[in-house]
């Protein structure tokens, strides 16, 4: 049996270092066993999935050197490799489960399910589906289907007993069936949920080993049941430890930049980032810290993965990147520097911004430096304003982050409109609103136009600089966050409308 592993990202955001981490271990496991590593795009969430996100994911993984033998961009014997192009496949499998008695129709409305969960919580119970669809007679089901009532298809789950499955790192895992919900397999719009599409595709694409994050452990019983219901062999499971911040919390963009593009943009070498991800819970047999992808594949043993949450420490990554830089010849370093900022359009944008401000070419260094720096040197005192209160400064930065993060169209028109709308909704004059953004992005109020600067440096560096500025002036507490989220939404409403802030 040929080993086949896969990475199956969802194109709903910027490419995450966690995706690269899981992809790396899947690739090493497959190659160490003489197998194949494939890439599949799981874009069943049609509302949030975008072609731009998919392309960024493919580009960032390629940049790292994580190459796949089958995928949406290279094809293969199991094409298509986008779930959105496989939609005709899944419904029949869901209907087959109905025929075999392993799944059932549910006609409960969203309001009925909300009421069900509220009543369960009031009784001190963990909210879960109560099986009401199982109580319907065949005649009633057929009548409601014929009437065209909206419905979903759910899988049946045992009410008692223990689900047992083996994990490469954890041995035998036991999860009570009482903790497993009757998962929706096919939604009211006829589209599959992650669980159905994932299992069907892994089987049809002959995946033999599934290496994924440990957050999917609670889903393993559902997947095991589906494999049993279909009569298929289940792939060997391996749930990898999650990457964590230095404070041991789950890695999140609030505390550490998580986009692969961010690390590329600040000048981390792809070999160094891949090397660092390879050290996340794993080590070379000789404990060396600097190694290549080829080295890792050659010496890879999944049993060397530690289940302790690996810490993603940016300072350690920077140190390791320094080791890789120091190993280059001066000529190689020059090539890397030139390729790092070689995009002619970006350089033209910078030249356009600084041209009205310089009389000598040598003056370009001072005006353009912040475009290339990792982070500007800023202090809390720099954000003190005679026009805005400290809370207004903090809120303007946080609200801008939230609104900008929701955009995939990153151009001057979009960024400018978001910031101008926010200033207007907060009832702040634009000339009083913008200094905080000049300081956060450029480190000074004397700078090139900041909205265009944000476009030029790109979303990842923009978010990182805005978050750092927010940390310096005072990031919101958990209690404040809840209030601010509602306030931010209420600001978007017409002046005569409000939201409940209780």
Curated annotation (Swiss-Prot):
Q: Which InterPro entries match?
A: aa-tRNA-synth_I_cd-bd (IPR045462), aa-tRNA-synth_I_codon-bd_sub2 (IPR020751), aa-tRNA-synth_I_CS (IPR001412), aa_tRNA-synth_I_cd-bd_sf (IPR008925), Glu-tRNA-ligase_bac/mito (IPR004527), Glu/Gln-tRNA-synth (IPR000924), Glu/Gln-tRNA-synth_Ib_cat-dom (IPR020058), GluQ/Sye (IPR049940)
From which residue to which does any coiled coil extend?
Answer: none
Q: Which GO terms describe its biological process?
A: glutamyl-tRNA aminoacylation
Q: Which domain of life is it from?
A: Bacteria
EC number of this enzyme: 6.1.1.17
Sorted keywords for this record are: Aminoacyl-tRNA synthetase, ATP-binding, Cytoplasm, Ligase, Nucleotide-binding, Protein biosynthesis
**Is ATP-binding given among the entry's keywords?**
yes
Q: Where is this motif: 'KMSKS' region?
A: 250-254
Aminoacyl-tRNA synthetase among the record's keywords?
yes
Residues that bind ATP = 253
GO terms of molecular function: ATP binding; glutamate-tRNA ligase activity; tRNA binding; zinc ion binding
Q: How does it assemble?
A: Monomer.
The function of this protein is: Catalyzes the attachment of glutamate to tRNA(Glu) in a two-step reaction: glutamate is first activated by ATP to form Glu-AMP and then transferred to the acceptor end of tRNA(Glu).
- Please name the HAMAP family in this protein's record: Glu_tRNA_synth_type1 (MF_00022)
Q: What is this protein called?
A: Glutamate--tRNA ligase
Source organism of this protein record: Acinetobacter baylyi (strain ATCC 33305 / BD413 / ADP1)
């Amino acid at each position: 049996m040929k080993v086949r592993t896969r990475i199956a990202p969802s194109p709903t955001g910027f490419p995450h270092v966690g995706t690269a981490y899981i992809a790396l271990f899947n690739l090493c496991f497959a190659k160490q066993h003489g197998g194949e590593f494939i890439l599949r795009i799981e874009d069943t969430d049609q509302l949030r999935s975008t072609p731009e996100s998919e392309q960024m994911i493919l580009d960032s993984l390629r940049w790292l050197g994580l190459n796949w033998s089958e995928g949406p961009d290279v094809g293969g014997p199991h094409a298509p490799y986008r779930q959105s192009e496989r939609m005709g496949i899944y419904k029949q499998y869901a209907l087959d489960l109905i025929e075999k008695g392993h799944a059932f129709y549910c006609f409960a409305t969203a309001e009925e399910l909300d009421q069900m969960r509220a009543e369960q919580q009031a009784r001190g119970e963990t909210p879960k589906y109560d099986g009401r669809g199982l109580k319907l007679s065949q005649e009633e089901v057929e009548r409601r289907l014929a009437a065209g009532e909206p419905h979903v298809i759910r899988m049946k789950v045992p009410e008692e007993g223990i689900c047992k499955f083996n994990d490469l790192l954890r041995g035998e895992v036991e999860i009570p069936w009482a903790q497993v919900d009757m998962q929706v397999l096919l939604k009211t719009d006829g589209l599959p949920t992650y669980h159905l599409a994932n299992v069907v595709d892994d089987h049809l694409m002959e995946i033999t080993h599934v290496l994924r994050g440990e957050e999917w452990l609670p889903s393993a019983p559902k997947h095991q049941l589906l494999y049993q219901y279909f009569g298929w062999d289940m792939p060997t499971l391996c749930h990898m430890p999650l990457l964590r911040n230095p404070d041991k919390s789950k890695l999140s963009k609030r505390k550490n930049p998580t986009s692969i593009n961010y690390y590329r943009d600040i000048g981390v070498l792809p070999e160094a980032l891949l090397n660092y991800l390879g050290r996340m819970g794993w080590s070379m047999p000789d404990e060396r810290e600097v190694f290549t992808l080829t080295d890792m594949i050659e010496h890879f043993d999944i049993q060397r993965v530690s289940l302790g949450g690996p810490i993603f420490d940016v300072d350690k990554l920077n140190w390791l990147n320094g080791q890789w830089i120091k190993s280059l010849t001066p000529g190689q370093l020059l090539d890397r520097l030139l390729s790092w900022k070689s995009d002619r359009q970006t350089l033209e944008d910078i030249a356009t911004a600084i041209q009205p401000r310089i009389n000598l070419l040598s003056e370009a260094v001072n005006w353009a430096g912040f475009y290339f720096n990792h982070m500007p040197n800023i202090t809390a005192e720099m954000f003190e304003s005679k026009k805005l209160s400290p809370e207004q400064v903090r809120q303007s930065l946080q609200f801008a982050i939230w609104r900008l993060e929701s955009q995939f169209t990153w151009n001057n028109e979009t960024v400018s409109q978001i910031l101008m709308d926010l200033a207007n909704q907060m009832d702040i004059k634009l000339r009083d609103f913008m200094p905080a953004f000049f300081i956060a992005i450029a480190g000074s109020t004397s700078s090139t136009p900041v909205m265009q600067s944000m476009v030029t440096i790109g979303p990842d560096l923009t978010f990182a600089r805005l978050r750092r500025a927010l940390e310096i002036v005072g990031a919101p507490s958990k209690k404040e966050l809840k209030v601010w989220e509602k306030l931010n939404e209420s600001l978007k409403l017409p002046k005569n409308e409000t939201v409940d802030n209780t």
